[in-house]
């Protein structure tokens, strides 16, 4: 079963509830646009389990370099990376979002290694679509990227999270496969006793994608009690897989 959601904010809002279990039964929840997939707010004893999360057009776009020339790159676009070309300018886009400059990492499939990198949108003079999904990219100077490398590109703005848990206690997420997390991962704040079991942040096997999210996958901020993270797998982050910290704010007049 695949469910498609095409609106902003959260598809699943749990607020002020207790003793609830939502079992997805292996369903895939497919997001279209920049969305927060779920919110657990002021709840107690909530379990979410047994479903997959993915996006129609992930906000991190991917190209694989086929050829490097004196002043050009020949690039193959991943099918889930949507774009348009206006006056020879390359613009990445999805439902309600777009960018034409940003941040990038490169990924080496053979070595399974990722580096911070220059962005192939930088210094780009013009782009020509040779055929759908195949781009000829002209540069002011010789681009320093060999064939076979994959660019993972994104905007610098983190304006949506995959999931939000706040002001809640005794929350459990179990057996959830997150093929793409969006502009941030699952953020837990001001909550108590959290359990994350068998969460798999990784591109869907066979999809050809190499990244899973903008930033931290699990961020726990200002929480208390016991936080359990067991039997999880994290692949393709542009920041920390797990980040646990306090939240300290200075009050000024």
For each feature predicted by the language model, list its residue ranges.
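Residues in short coils/turns that link rungs of repeat/solenoid architectures in beta-rich domains
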Residues: 29-31, 55, 180, 203, ...
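All-beta strand scaffolds that present successive hydrophobic residues in beta-strands
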Residues: 21-24, 45-50, 170-175, 193-199, ...
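Beta-strand/loop edge motif enriched in small/polar residues
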Residues: 155-165, 173-181, 196, 213-238
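A general structural signal for short secondary-structure junctions and capping/turn motifs
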Residues: 39, 127, 187, 232-234
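Acidic/polar low-complexity surface segments
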Residues: 3-14, 56-159, 198-220, 239-253
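Extracellular beta-strand-rich solenoid/capping regions of secreted or surface-exposed proteins
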Residues: 3-21, 30-49, 54-73, 157-168, ...
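Conserved, compact domain cores that house catalytic/ligand-binding motifs in diverse enzymes
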Residues: 161, 165-207, 243
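Short, solvent-exposed linear motifs at loop/edge-of-secondary-structure regions
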Residues: 13-26, 226, 231-250
């Amino acid at each position: 079963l695949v469910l498609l959601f095409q609106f902003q904010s959260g598809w699943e809002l749990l607020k002020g509830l207790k003793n609830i279990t939502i079992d997805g039964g292996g369903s895939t929840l497919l997001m279209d646009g920049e969305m927060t997939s779920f919110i657990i707010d002021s709840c107690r004893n909530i379990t979410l389990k047994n479903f997959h999360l993915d996006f129609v057009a992930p906000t991190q776009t991917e190209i694989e370099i086929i050829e490097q020339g004196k002043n050009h790159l020949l690039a193959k676009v991943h099918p889930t990376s949507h774009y348009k070309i206006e006056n020879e300018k390359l613009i990445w886009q999805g439902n309600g979002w777009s960018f034409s400059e940003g941040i990038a990492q490169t990924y080496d499939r053979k070595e399974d290694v990722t580096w911070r990198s220059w962005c192939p949108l930088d210094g780009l003079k013009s782009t020509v679509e040779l055929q759908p999904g195949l781009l000829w990219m002209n540069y002011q100077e010789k681009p320093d990227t060999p064939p076979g490398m994959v660019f993972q590109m994104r905007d610098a703005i983190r304006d949506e999270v995959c999931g939000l848990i706040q002001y809640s206690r005794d929350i459990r997420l179990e057996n959830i496969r997150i093929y793409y997390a969006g502009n941030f991962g699952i953020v837990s704040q001001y909550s108590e006793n959290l359990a994350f079991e068998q969460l798999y942040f990784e591109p869907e096997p066979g999809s050809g994608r190499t990244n899973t999210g903008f930033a931290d996958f699990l961020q726990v901020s200002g929480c208390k009690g016991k936080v359990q993270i067991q039997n999880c797998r994290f692949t393709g982050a542009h920041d920390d897989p797990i980040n646990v910290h306090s939240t300290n704010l200075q009050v000024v007049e």
